[in-house]
Each structure stands twice: as C-alpha cells, then as structure tokens.
C-alpha cells in the first residue's frame, strides 16, 4: 500500500501512467485519485470497480484482472509515448508472485529492448497465494540477503538498471528511491523488500494470512 501511495506522491498522474498488476494493488491508488468514498461508505461500494477501469477514472488505463500483465501493458504505453514524442513517466507495479508468469518475462525483455523511460516497481514480500518457489525466487532471496549487491542479478542480466530498497515499509526510504528514478531516461527496476501485513500483528505472524475477516 505504501508503494502505491509513493507512486501517486512522486508522479504526475494521470500524465504519468501507472499500471498495477492484478488490480487489487490499485485500491490505495483509487482512494488517492478521488474515489475514497467508495471504500468508506457502504452505500457507495458499488460506485467503483474492483479493478482499474478507464471508464471510471482518467487515472486508470486498462481493465486489469489477471496476474503478470502490468509490465507488458506498461511497455505498450512506453512505446506509444515514444512514437508520439511524449515525455511522461511510465510505471509498472508488480509483486514477486506475479513475476513467475511468462508475460512478465516478456514485458521485462521488451522494456530492456525499448531502452527508454520505464520504472518497474517490484513489491517483494516473498509471497504469492502461498510461498514462492523456483529459480527466480532463489535469486530474489540472494538479492535481499546481499542488499541488492550480489553478482547474480536477474534484472541486470536482462539489460535493466536496478536499485534495491531494503525496508520497503519505511516511507522515507521509498521517497528517496522514487526521487532518484523519477524522469529517468532508461528502464529501471526498483526492487522493494516488504513485509506483508506490516502493522497488523496477526498478519505479520502468519505470512499466509492475506485476508482477515473481523
């Protein structure tokens, strides 16, 4: 959620375009772009979609309900910007769980090929629906354990620039990271290590507790 807030804080939406993977990551984005009442008042719950929705707001660019799509969609926006001489930031937000999808790999590959402004925010909380497994996740762990400094770096190997934020729940650390990459003229991955459920003790103690009914 903090990452979503920082995207809005340090971007000029809707000129700068933010694409959220799956769409549930976009709820704070919706709250900060004029739609908060739909989350606060039961009589207004049906006024917004559960997904990003261009017909609902100029801050939304796609109807997104599937995983692993944000990076590829953002590369399309970046290509369109470049063809029309634009200069806005294109930002893709994706979780580590979604990185295992093939379309995410395709998007990363094409972002490197474009070589122009694109900011790819990887929210790494070490969880998908359950724990992550596989070679990619071993490398993400190596990056976390080395504070982003290990020689083997999946993102750099694909031709992308890279910075690491060790405490992605630290608002000031996020502000500093986003200020460094705003208006950058090449594709860069901002790898953010976060704790899922930070601030709610039950969620912090049970990493598979992604939804709590009280």
Question: What residues fall within each predicted segment?
Answer:
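Short beta-strand segments
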Residues: 19-22, 93-94, 119-123, 191-196
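Short acidic, glycine/serine/threonine-rich loops at helix termini
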Residues: 28-34, 99-108, 130-135, 141, ...
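Conserved thiamine diphosphate
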Residues: 79-89, 134-177
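Mobile "lid/hinge" segments at catalytic clefts and subdomain interfaces of large enzymes
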Residues: 112-137, 143-145
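Terminal amphipathic helices with adjacent charged low-complexity linkers/tails
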Residues: 172-211
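Glycine-rich beta-alpha junction loops
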Residues: 24, 125-127, 169, 194-199
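Cofactor-binding active-site loop characterized by glycine-rich and histidine/acidic residues
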Residues: 4-5, 9-114
């Amino acid at each position: 959620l903090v990452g979503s807030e920082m995207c809005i804080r340090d971007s000029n939406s809707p000129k700068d375009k933010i694409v959220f993977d799956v769409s549930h990551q976009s709820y704070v984005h919706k709250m900060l772009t004029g739609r908060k009442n739909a989350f606060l008042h039961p009589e207004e719950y049906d006024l917004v979609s559960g997904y990003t929705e261009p017909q609902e707001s100029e801050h939304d660019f796609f109807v997104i309900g599937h995983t692993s799509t944000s990076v590829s969609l953002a590369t399309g926006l970046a290509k369109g910007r470049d063809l029309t001489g634009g200069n806005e930031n294109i930002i893709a937000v994706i979780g580590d769980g979604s990185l295992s999808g093939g379309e995410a790999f395709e998007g990363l590959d094409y972002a490197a090929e474009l070589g122009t402004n694109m900011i790819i925010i990887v929210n790494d909380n070490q969880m998908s629906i359950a724990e992550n497994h596989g070679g990619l996740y071993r490398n993400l762990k190596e990056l976390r354990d080395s504070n982003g400094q290990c020689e083997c770096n999946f993102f750099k190997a694909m031709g992308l620039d890279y910075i690491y934020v060790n405490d992605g729940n630290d608002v000031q650390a996020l502000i500093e990271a986003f200020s460094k990459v705003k208006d950058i003229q090449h594709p860069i991955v901002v790898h953010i290590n976060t704790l899922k459920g930070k601030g709610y003790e039950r969620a912090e103690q049970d990493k598979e507790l992604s939804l709590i009914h009280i």
